[in-house]
């Protein structure tokens, strides 16, 4: 258990494979470009837990992208496909709905076999570094806030980056295999009493939720609340008033349904706006709010809710949707693995600090389950299977640590035991003490008589 907590049992490593399609180049040219680009990438990377590995995609069967998942020429998953295409200028174009990066190059940029550097290789390496910089920073931040060994903790992040990532962790809702989404319409009057939310969700939200299916499932419900008054009033809402806008005492917003986390998305009918501009805002780990005068067009609101959902689930803020989802898988896997490992360490330290504490069989079973799935999560780190095993391990670790019978013992110090048992020992102790005193007096009397 301590080995997991101290990072000796598993070293989180994310070797991302990137496939290069270079059909326009000869074999020796593409191989030389790959080696040159790989050297440039290695020189730029100073974080050993997250590194990019290039490979050439065989032109015979090529690489394809299916449902946002890339496969190399031999069916292996890759994080990104780079397609090298001849052009009149050097530029990169990342496709919005596929993990494919089109890199255009000029003929004079193809490196010769005798050259050790290449402007094209440098350009590709810098582009890849920028694309995965946010993911690398996320994983580095998770490691820096865990109990990993000092040699595995990356160098300190820039203050502004660390601050941004701290807000990211505060904003993101806890990972769950299933989330419940509640879409609510609140109006201060009797109108509108209905809205075309089903069609809007079907057209603009369901495609996003389907793309999340490897990571999480979603259930949805909707509601309309009439004569709803917000917690604050006024035409201009100050930023410090936004958290009080939700009238929790009167608005029927369930915090959870069926044991799964609930994410609330709320449209309020009114003419109010936020100080400084804007009519929507995000509430960390809760949901999003939009104020608009009518509901004639729900498309902008649903698109805003989609962006807020991505933010609440912890997805990075840039690049194409498939890359953001794959990054989320890797980051969530690392976070759950580190959290479960830390919980195991806390449980081990607890048993050492309180040697008299009894360990129920359910806790022992939970520890065994956690360690088993931690091992499987470490082996499959970065993939769907690794994420699922990390989730099971984290849930089992939390359940074992907060076992109610053990919690009661932890918060039952020796002073409380004395207070409980002393009244019971009093009736027994007094006759014993008096009997001892009587026997001592009798012994002393007999001794004087001698």
For each feature predicted by the language model, list its residue ranges.
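Juxtamembrane extramembrane loops of integral membrane proteins
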Residues: 1-94
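Short, flexible coil/linker elements and helix-boundary hinge sites characteristic
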Residues: 7, 45, 53, 146-147, ...
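C-terminal membrane-proximal segments flanking the terminal transmembrane helix
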Residues: 67, 382, 386-387, 401, ...
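Short, flexible/disordered secondary-structure transition segments
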Residues: 219, 351, 404-411, 436, ...
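Membrane-proximal extracellular juxtamembrane segment immediately upstream
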Residues: 324-418
């Amino acid at each position: 258990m301590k080995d997991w907590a101290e990072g000796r049992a598993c070293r989180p490593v994310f070797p991302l494979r990137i496939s290069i399609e270079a059909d326009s180049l000869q074999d020796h040219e593409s191989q030389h470009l790959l080696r040159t680009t790989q050297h440039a990438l290695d020189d730029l990377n100073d974080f050993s837990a997250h590194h990019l590995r290039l490979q050439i995609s065989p032109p015979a069967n090529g690489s394809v992208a299916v449902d946002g998942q890339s496969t190399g020429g031999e069916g292996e998953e890759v994080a990104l496909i780079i397609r090298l295409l001849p052009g009149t200028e050097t530029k990169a174009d990342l496709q919005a709905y596929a993990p494919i990066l089109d890199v255009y190059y000029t003929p004079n940029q193809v490196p010769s076999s005798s050259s050790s550097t290449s402007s094209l290789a440098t350009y590709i390496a810098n582009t890849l570094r920028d694309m995965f910089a946010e993911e690398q920073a996320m994983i580095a931040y998770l490691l820096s806030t865990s109990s990993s060994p000092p040699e595995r903790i990356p160098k300190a992040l820039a203050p502004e980056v660390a601050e941004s990532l701290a807000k990211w962790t505060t904003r993101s809702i806890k990972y769950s295999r299933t989330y419940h989404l509640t879409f609510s319409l609140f109006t201060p009057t009797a109108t509108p009493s209905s809205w075309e939310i089903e069609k809007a969700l079907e057209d603009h939200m369901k495609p996003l939720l389907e793309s999340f299916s490897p990571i999480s499932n979603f259930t949805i419900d909707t509601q309309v609340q009439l004569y709803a008054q917000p917690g604050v009033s006024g035409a201009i809402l100050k930023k410090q008033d936004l958290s009080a806008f939700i009238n929790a005492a009167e608005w029927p917003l369930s915090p959870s349904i069926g044991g799964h986390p609930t994410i609330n998305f709320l449209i309020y009918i009114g003419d109010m706006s936020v100080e400084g501009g804007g009519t929507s805002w995000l509430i960390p780990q809760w949901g999003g709010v939009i104020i608009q005068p009518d509901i004639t067009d729900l498309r902008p609101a649903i698109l805003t809710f989609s962006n807020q959902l991505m933010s609440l689930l912890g997805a990075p803020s840039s690049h194409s949707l498939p890359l953001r989802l794959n990054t989320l898988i890797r980051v969530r896997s690392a976070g759950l693995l580190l959290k479960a490992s830390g919980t195991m360490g806390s449980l081990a330290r607890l048993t050492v600090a309180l040697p008299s504490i009894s360990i129920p069989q359910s806790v022992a079973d939970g520890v065994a389950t956690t360690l088993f799935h931690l091992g499987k999560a470490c082996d499959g780190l970065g993939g769907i299977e690794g994420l699922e095993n990390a989730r099971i391990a984290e849930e089992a670790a939390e359940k074992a640590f907060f076992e109610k019978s053990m919690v009661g013992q932890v918060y039952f110090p020796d002073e409380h035991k004395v207070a409980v048992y002393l009244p019971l020992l009093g009736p027994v102790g007094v006759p014993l003490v008096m009997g001892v005193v009587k026997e001592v007096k009798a012994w002393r009397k007999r001794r004087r008589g001698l």
